[in-house]
Design a protein with these regions (language model features):
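Rossmann-like NAD(P)-binding element
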Residues: 59-100, 105-108
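Internal alpha-helical scaffold of NAD(P)-dependent oxidoreductase catalytic cores
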Residues: 149, 153-223, 227-262
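Conserved hydrophobic residues forming the short capping helix/wall of the S-adenosyl-L-methionine
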Residues: 50, 124-125, 248, 317
Length: 371
């Protein structure tokens, strides 16, 4: 690590597969890493090994200098704190971080889902955080890999295109140079509407689960993308995708269609979305080879992607008077199927700090910050 502007010491919060992705890439690259999780069983073998073994052409050993359930030693002196916990836990993590943060630190959400940076900013403020910290978010996980054991992974593919945004957007010029050496494929986005509306998980996961609910609940272990995305499911993808792009455009954000996103990120574009999903599964380097089928509808593909993805997209559509009938239908069907009212607990305009304002004012908030 030679760039004087970039982060040197990085704390990763969340020791799931997303956290291991980051340890593998950043540790081999020479960044000083700390790892935190509330579950010590996820940390003990990494702590005993002193890091993670990474297979492959650019593999090696990724050392972790601290692996702890205690946030204070995990974050003390860190330049960047990367939160890889899933969208539903981001506010909880922010409240725990609030008294420990120091001026100049950057919190990076991987991923921000839709509105993550706003949620974290409000949580820090509500918890009385006085430190001057920056908040950034990425639109997706940067890598795909196989976990061979608790301390050994094999990378599959690096995403070719990622976006990083800050909240407020006017901080990107200061923050991006510190983060770009960690993620060379990333580009700076003008604000968090760009990253939030490039939330592919919300597009891909919920519709597939709803359309294949019978298979999921009967225990059919189908290939989630190659077999789950039929022509009808692909048309549903297209419908919710068109609404996502339209709401983003009404807020001044230009975001890629689903087909364009697949091509930018993975270099794959089939004649149809069905073909694209099959190639992403069956190609030798296909990132979806190991995508598991949910065992029930009580799965993060629903419990995370509805409240932190579809709910805020629908709410922002209402604020800009852009209809989202397909997204709204999915939300209602999920409520009926699961009995969970995700609209009541999700990222509403009120929770985002955007209630009572129109699209132009929302654009001002994401550029300049909450007042």
């Amino acid at each position: 690590v030679t760039d004087e502007n970039c982060a040197k010491t990085v704390t990763i919060i969340g020791a799931g597969i997303g956290g291991l992705y980051l340890i593998a890439e950043l540790g081999v690259a020479g960044f000083k890493l700390r790892l935190h999780d509330i579950d010590d069983s996820k940390l003990s073998e990494i702590r005993g090994r002193g890091g993670v073994d990474v297979e492959g052409e650019k593999g090696g050993f990724a050392p972790v200098e601290r692996a702890t359930t205690d946030l204070e030693p995990a974050t003390d002196g860190a330049d960047v704190i990367i939160v890889v916990t899933g969208g539903n836990a981001q506010a909880v993590v922010a409240r725990s971080l609030a008294p420990l943060l120091r001026d100049g630190q950057v919190i990076l959400l991987i991923q921000g889902n839709t509105g993550g940076s706003l949620i974290v900013r409000r949580a820090l403020d509500d918890a009385g955080c006085r430190a001057e910290v920056d908040i950034a978010e990425m639109d997706n996980y940067p890598y795909s890999c196989w976990r061979l054991s608790p301390t050994r992974i094999r990378p599959i593919v690096r995403k070719r295109w990622l976006q990083i945004a800050t909240f407020p957007g006017n901080r990107i010029g200061e923050v991006f140079p510190r983060l770009s050496p960690l993620f060379p494929e990333a580009v700076a986005a003008p604000n968090c509407l760009y990253t939030g509306f490039t939330n592919a998980n919300a597009m891909l996961h919920v519709a597939n689960c709803v359309a294949n609910a019978g298979r999921i609940e009967s225990g059919d272990s189908y290939k989630f993308y190659a077999e789950g995305v039929t022509p009808g499911v692909a048309r549903l993808y297209e419908a919710i995708n068109a609404e996502r792009v339209a709401v983003a455009a009404a807020l001044g954000a230009s975001v890629p269609t689903l087909a364009d996103w697949f091509e930018r990120v993975y270099g794959v574009r089939g004649a149809t979305l069905v073909e694209t999903c099959q190639r992403l599964t069956y190609n030798s380097d296909g990132p979806y080879q190991e995508t598991g089928t949910p065992k029930s509808l009580d799965h993060k593909f629903i419990t995370e992607d509805v409240p932190t993805g579809l709910i805020p997209m629908s709410a922002l559509g209402a604020a800009t008077r852009v209809g989202t009938p397909a997204i709204d239908a999915l939300i209602e069907i999920v409520r009926s199927m699961t009995g969970n009212d995700f609209a009541a607990e999700g990222r509403t305009l009120g929770r985002l700090g955007l209630s009572g304002i129109d699209g132009l004012e929302i654009r001002h908030v994401v550029e300049e910050g909450l007042t």
